[in-house]
Amino acid sequence: QQVKRAAPGGSGYTLDHYSAEALKAYVAPFNDAFKGREGKIRAIFNDSFEVYGTDFTPNFFEEFKKLRGYDLKNQLSLLLNETDNEEGNRIRSDYRQTISDLLLHKFDKSWTNWAHSKNFKTKLQAHGSPGNLIDLYASADIPECETFGSMPFDIPGLRRDKEDIREGDADPVMLKFSSSAAHISGKNLVSSETFTWLREHFKTALSQCKPEAEDIMLNGVNHIFLHGSTYSPDRAVWPGWQFYASVNFNSNNTIWEDAPSLFSYISNCQSLLQQGKPDNEILLYWPIFDAWDNCQKGTLFFQFKIHSLSEWLYGTSFYDTTKNLIKKGYSTDFISDHFIAEAKVVNGTIILSGGSYKSLIVPACKKMPLETLQKLIELKKAGASIIFEGLPESVPGFNDYKNGEQNLKKILADNVSLITPEDIFKALENKNIKPESLVNTGLKFIRRDVDGEKVYYIVNHTKETIDDFIPLQIANREVLILNPLTKEFGNAMVTKKDQTTLVKLKMEPGQAFFLKTEKIASQKKWTYYKSDGKSFPLKGNWNLTFDKGGPKLPQNDVVSTL
């Protein structure tokens, strides 16, 4: 494949992402260019994987045999046969796993190591890659997700004209792959390519940007980047140079004068969302081998794209369980086989390099490596809460798989305690792992732990005003309300009941607050406003004047209605 939209001097074939030698040759000119500039660039960036059909590398067969234990050349007829059958699917699964391993170790991790040798950090968009997204995102210092198009919100008055939008791909489950990778691997920053194609050029309002930004922050992003801020020289004909993909954040756009208000809001949110550590209590296993074992209509090379979620995410037990956990009020991070292998148990808590968790849920899946199953049993015996929605039916891959299946059956027979509960939520409650029932009001939230206290980011994307006492799953606390838009703050009215603190909130549609728990009230009381129900109609004519814009201004006008 040729490089898309190449910069000057950058045209030609794309890099071989599965070859250490290719990466070494690729970075050689940059070694010279960055001499004396080590540490002077904060981070280098790798965009989403948009290299299509890169299904081979010169030493692939040798790497495959080393990793999978058999000679793929002897199975090419099954590999390339597009028939949906067990042995062909197993060989395709091995092929896809090998591509994933090579991408992770030959490029992504090696690229980050090279950047560290220059004292740079790395930002990586792993989506679109033909590999395990969790492991790939986690290989970078700053995992980065992407929003594309416009998402629907119930906020009254929010304009979403069909002719000006592209339907959005910012599914909360997809967004959580990047933040989960950051959380379980101990990376504090999660970035995003934000507002890509939110509306057509010059048709985006800041009010339309705000809920989109809120949705990604609610799913773990705390380091927003714009898409895009286009350079445009003074000599350019009005309205200046434009990037093909909107939004156009620059001085030629009418929203530019008021954009600082949006930027201030995002900055205030991120300053709190970067403090402390994530406070998600549940881990959810991503059974990627079920995706790799899928025939995919005979397609050998398979990419996990954000624009084709129906091919690999929608309709899976993993997706459904994630949505159900979110709906119930549980905070969840995803985990891969690799990170399960690194997990430990301390006093019943699952410990990873990035944090601690109260439970690990395994959604119903067909294929699971023996090593993963054995590790889960080990964690359970050590006191961890491991909940199986369904037990695996087989092992992945082709090499000696029938023997592997027998071993799997024996392990399951020897561990009859691995029963699947009828209701995972009752199983969680039995472990005293309770959800945040505030979601029953329609409010959305994300929670962080800052020095033992909880910080909640709460957003009202409903069409209703929420005016009630909202329960927080923390006992005997005072609560500080902070408004990130106006910078107002004060201590809320609270009622303390058992292990719950009830907080008085009044939130209009589209409004967002931070709630910070504390042992003793530290600030003045929060001001609660109440409407007196009166309305004041505005009558008469309006003088409409156009004082800015170009290249020509419309004529002034007098209108009777707005």
Predicted regions and their residues:
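Catalytic and substrate-binding clefts that recognize carbohydrates or anionic sugar/phosphate headgroups
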Residues: 1-35
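Carbohydrate-binding surfaces of carbohydrate-active enzymes
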Residues: 30-43, 48-143, 148-562
